[in-house]
Amino acid sequence: MLNFVRIFLPFLKYQVFTDKTNDLLKYNIYVFDVDKKLNKLQIKNIIEYIFNIKIYSINTYIKNNKYCCFNKIKGLKTNYKRAFIRLKSVNIIPYFSC
């Protein structure tokens, strides 16, 4: 199990903590930024295995690139995939619940 977590944990970047996402915790919806290459089934398998929970549904979207300037260099910020994970009513993620 430890090898599985060590391999797939970098794909799960971090949980998003904003005012809107904290309001979603009341409805048992958690928001994570994940690797862009993962699909819904892979996200589901990783989270179910790491946290030992059952997932009801997953919604994802990819944020658009944003232009940024640093001194005279113009470039694009990297885009990422955001996953909204709804759990079954009896499950919670103990480290991220409100």
Swiss-Prot record:
Coiled-coil annotated residue ranges, if any: none
UniProt keyword annotations, A-Z: Plastid, Ribonucleoprotein, Ribosomal protein, RNA-binding, rRNA-binding
UniProt GO BP: translation
Keyword Cytoplasm carried by entry: no
GO molecular function (one): rRNA binding
Entry keyword rRNA-binding: yes
Major localisation: plastid
Purpose of the protein: Binds to 23S rRNA.
Designated name of the protein: Large ribosomal subunit protein uL23c
Biological source species: Euglena longa
